[in-house]
Curated annotation (Swiss-Prot):
Species of provenance: Aspergillus oryzae (strain ATCC 42149 / RIB 40)
InterPro entries referenced in this protein's UniProt entry, alphabetically: CRIP, Cyclophilin-like_dom_sf, Cyclophilin-type_PPIase_dom, Cyclophilin_PPIL4, Nucleotide-bd_a/b_plait_sf, RBD_domain_sf, RRM_dom
Domain PPIase cyclophilin-type: 1-171
Top EC class of this enzyme: isomerase
Protein name: Peptidyl-prolyl cis-trans isomerase-like 4
Subcellular location: Nucleus
Length: 461
């Protein structure tokens, strides 16, 4: 009575102790027959102690129920677990001892219950497990696989960083009859979506054997990042999962609020040609947010600026320089704004490439361009703006004259120091002036006649 376990690290052959623990052996054999253990992960490894498996999903899955016995699969959840009594003569004194993982029954603490999970010892004389795990088999082949499991890289919870899974189970000999309702599948089933979701580093992925634990953890994080990127692509947040940040763009932060675009452009331009340099500002207030993006023409200049400008003092602030990667959203918004500016310079207007912003108001504007000369739109090249004539028609002039010479008292009230009530010499009507001149002429003529008559009279005397 033996079972062959095909694992991702090699094959293990287990001889079952059907006479000492028949119920545990029957449960294990029938679960292997229905391929229940296929793709089950080794979810706990304790170096030189044990490794544990048998849960198809593993404890990290939210859908895991911890596993089920064969009777639970056939008859329902009430039979998910079954009670076991540890054989008194069997001890965990040899490496490769196989036993069912048990827990105290919630109804009777002295009774142990089991489901589908089992453990395999990686050391000798492990009497701690006696009475807590029920022995039902021993490993007879595949001790090299046990050594590989024992040397596997694990995290702080004991889970291998690279998946170790049971791929297939093959029953070499089965002395037990099948329980009612058991139907063996014709072929091994494919992993379910819930099982695939528990993959960390696939068991078939080639890794460097010389990698330390830190490198393994880094690789695991990279795999998780790729999985998250694929999710973002599916929901439309990324154009494609393998999108990478630009390699010629620097992210500069910890800037002084007074630092301007021109200042950074001047400082960083010594490393190469800069396509764009922009300090990001608040859209509402226009205040500097104290970080900027600098786009170089080529990657080499960008890398040189990265190594030379880290921690440099600019406007009494030591700046931090990095490649645009961890701030991808900020970089994306800045890049979109830059592209829209460039498209506007190429002729696009209002987000429509077929429209063009009008650059002049009149056809003659180009002919009147002057250096250092600011003129109005309607000046047509006159250096000094012309003033409007306020006497455009005789009627308007006459009306204006009548309003201007209404009453001497009114004029006196307006400006008593400039005009007095008896001052009538400032006449605004040409006709009135002509009559006044005529009267003045007649008056002078009469005076001369009187003077002549007086002169004649004196001569006669």
């Amino acid at each position: 009575m033996s079972v062959l376990l095909e694992t991702s690290l090699g094959d293990i052959v287990i001889d079952l102790l059907v006479d000492e623990c028949p119920k545990a052996c029957e449960n294990f054999l029938k679960l292997c027959k229905v391929k229940y253990y296929n793709f089950s992960p080794v979810h706990s490894v304790q170096k030189n102690f044990t490794f544990q498996t048998g849960d198809p999903l593993g404890p990290d899955s939210s859908e895991s129920d911890g596993g089920s016995s064969i009777w639970g699969l056939l008859e329902g959840p009430p039979k998910r677990t079954f009670s076991l009594e540890p054989p008194p003569k069997l001890k965990h004194d040899e490496r490769g001892t196989v036993s069912m993982a048990t827990v105290p029954s919630p109804h009777d603490p002295d009774q142990r219950i089991a489901a589908s999970q089992f453990i395999v010892t990686l050391g000798e004389n492990l009497d701690y497990l006696d009475g807590k795990a029920v022995i039902f088999g021993k490993v007879v082949e595949g001790f090299d696989v046990l050594e590989k499991v024992n040397e596997a890289f694990i995290d702080d919870r004991g889970r291998p960083l690279k998946d170790i899974r049971i791929r297939h189970t093959v029953i070499l000999d089965d002395p037990f009859d099948d329980p009612p309702g058991l139907v063996a599948p014709a072929e091994s089933p494919l992993p379910s979506k819930a099982q695939l979701a528990t993959v960390r580093i696939a068991d078939d992925e080639e890794l460097d054997d010389n990698m330390d634990e830190e490198s393994m953890e880094k690789l695991r994080r990279e795999r998780e990042a790729r999985a998250q990127a694929l999710t973002l692509e599916m929901v439309g947040d990324l154009p494609f999962a393998e999108v990478k940040p630009p390699e010629n763009v620097l992210f500069v932060c910890k800037l002084n609020p007074v630092t301007q675009d021109e200042d950074l452009h001047l400082i960083f331009s010594r490393f190469g040609t800069i396509l764009s340099c922009e300090v990001i500002r608040d859209k509402r207030t226009g205040d500097s947010l104290q970080y900027a993006f600098i786009e170089f023409e080529n990657q080499k200049d960008c890398e040189q600026a990265y190594f030379k400008m880290q921690g440099v003092l600019i406007d009494d602030h030591r700046i931090h320089v990095d490649f645009s990667q961890s701030v991808s959203k900020l970089s994306e918004s800045w890049r979109n704004a830059t592209i829209s500016k460039r498209s506007g310079q190429r002729g696009g207007f209002g987000g429509v490439a077929s429209l063009e912003k009008k650059r002049q108001y009149r056809a003659s504007d180009n002919a009147r361009e002057k250096e250092n000369d600011y003129t109005l739109v309607f000046d047509k090249g006159d250096k000094a703006p012309r003033r409007r004539s306020y006497s455009r028609s005789p009627q308007r002039s006459s009306n204006r004259d009548r309003r201007a010479s209404r009453s001497p008292r009114r004029d006196s009230y307006r400006d008593p120091y400039r005009r007095r009530p008896g001052d009538r010499s400032h006449s605004r009507s040409p006709a009135r002036g002509e009559y006044r001149d005529k009267d003045r002429g007649r008056y002078n003529h009469r005076e001369r006649r009187r003077d002549d008559e007086r002169y004649r009279e004196r001569r006669r005397r």
